[in-house]
């Protein structure tokens, strides 16, 4: 029998380990999305001026808000949900309900569209890591 999709090994994904209590949504608590937001911040903080999880806007089990200032000094409020990340405001802690911005699967994709300086910083960091690996491989 042939299928049109590729099977996914869920054991490599966080929270889907065999026997894990987090399989499905039972047992998850309201801090899960906030923890995810904190991980997003830690991942790309090196490539922006400022980025932090909002303390003013409410976090829930299905949504968290992240404030980011790009190297170009543009400020955004981002919404993080199961659908991904999207811009919901153009100032810290600001949600503009009328905005219909697209969702991005990753913070990298979103910042890549917002900030050429992010793209450059990310590329430079990647190049430095590759050069370090090359040096380590030659020793």
Curated annotation (Swiss-Prot):
Superkingdom of this protein's organism: Eukaryota
Gene3D superfamilies in alphabetical order: Hypothetical protein (hspc210) (3.30.2280.10)
Physiological role: A-kinase anchoring protein for GSK3B and PKA that regulates or facilitates their kinase activity towards their targets. The ternary complex enhances Wnt-induced signaling by facilitating the GSK3B- and PKA-induced phosphorylation of beta-catenin leading to beta-catenin degradation and stabilization respectively. Upon cAMP activation, the ternary complex contributes to neuroprotection against oxidative stress-induced apoptosis by facilitating the PKA-induced phosphorylation of DML1 and PKA-induced inactivation of GSK3B.
Region entry Required for PRKAR2A interaction, spans: 41-45
Record's keyword annotation contains Cytoplasm: yes
Pfam family, one: GSKIP_dom
Gene: Gskip
Region span, Interaction with GSK3B and acts as a GSK3B inhibitor: 115-139
Sites annotated Required for GSK3B interaction: 130
Keyword ATP-binding included in the entry's annotation: no
Modifications made to the protein after synthesis: Phosphorylated by GSK3B.
Keywords: Cytoplasm, Nucleus
GO MF, one example: protein kinase inhibitor activity
Annotated coiled-coil segments of the chain: none
Family indicated by similarity: Belongs to the GSKIP family.
Localization (cell): Cytoplasm; Nucleus
Protein name, UniProt field: GSK3B-interacting protein
Alphabetical GO biological process terms: intrinsic apoptotic signaling pathway in response to oxidative stress; negative regulation of protein kinase activity; positive regulation of canonical Wnt signaling pathway; regulation of Wnt signaling pathway
GO cellular component, one term: nucleus
Subunit: Forms a complex composed of PRKAR2A or PRKAR2B, GSK3B and GSKIP through GSKIP interaction; facilitates PKA-induced phosphorylation of GSK3B leading to GSK3B inactivation; recruits DNM1L through GSK3B for PKA-mediated phosphorylation of DNM1L; promotes beta-catenin degradation through GSK3B-induced phosphorylation of beta-catenin; stabilizes beta-catenin and enhances Wnt-induced signaling through PKA-induced phosphorylation of beta-catenin. Interacts with GSK3B; induces GSK3B-mediated phosphorylation of GSKIP and inhibits GSK3B kinase activity.
């Amino acid at each position: 029998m042939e299928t049109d999709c590729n099977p996914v090994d869920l054991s490599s994904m966080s929270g889907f380990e065999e026997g894990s209590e987090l399989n499905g949504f039972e047992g998850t608590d309201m801090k899960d999305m906030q923890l995810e937001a904190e991980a997003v911040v830690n991942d790309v903080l090196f490539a922006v001026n400022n980025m932090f999880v909002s303390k003013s806007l409410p976090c829930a089990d299905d949504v968290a808000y992240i404030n980011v200032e790009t190297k170009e000094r543009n400020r955004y409020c981002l919404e993080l949900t199961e659908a991904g990340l999207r811009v919901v405001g153009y100032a810290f802690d600001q949600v503009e309900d009328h905005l219909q911005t697209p969702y991005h699967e990753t913070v990298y994709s979103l910042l890549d569209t917002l900030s050429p300086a992010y793209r450059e910083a990310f590329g430079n960091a990647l190049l430095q890591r590759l050069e370090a690996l090359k040096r380590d491989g030659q020793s």
